[in-house]
């Protein structure tokens, strides 16, 4: 009940960390507009700008920021209703783990907690997010290669 994606990036851990945790960079590759910096224990808000998903809010609670090692947040299972109170909805945990490797960084993204979602929504949420993380791994790789 977890999604795990790994990618070898040809940049140092410090550069990947910056792309993940500086919200001004995160929005470029993730394709979202976020209202302010990531702060542990605080809610990060905004909206998705990825084509076809612009109607979705960006809402996450930052869980951990272990310098150049781990960045994690929980995000709620979104309703298609743009006015829904998503922050009180069941959520999953997203973890970005960074590991130095020869020639760059191994980035591992894990999303877990799908068992917390309503039974009727689990399979679709898992499939949608599995495909989404495949796309996001390509996005961050392209972003870092070009900048």
What are these regions (language model features)?
Residues 6-10, 47, 61, 97:
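Generic structural detector for well-ordered beta-strands
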Residues 20, 30, 75, 137, ...:
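Short, flexible helix/strand-to-coil boundary loops that buttress conserved ligand/catalytic motifs
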Residues 16-17, 26, 44-46, 62, ...:
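Hydrophobic pocket/interface hotspot
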Residues 113-147:
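A conserved amphipathic terminal alpha-helix motif
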Residues 1-35, 39:
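Hydrophobic ligand-binding cavity/cleft-lining segments
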Residues 32-47, 52-53:
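A solvent-exposed, acidic/Ser-Thr-rich amphipathic alpha-helical stretch
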Residues 11-12, 49, 124-128:
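Alpha-helical scaffold segments that form or flank carboxylate-/histidine-based iron centers
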Residues 35-37, 55-103, 112:
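Hydrophobic-ligand binding "helix-grip"
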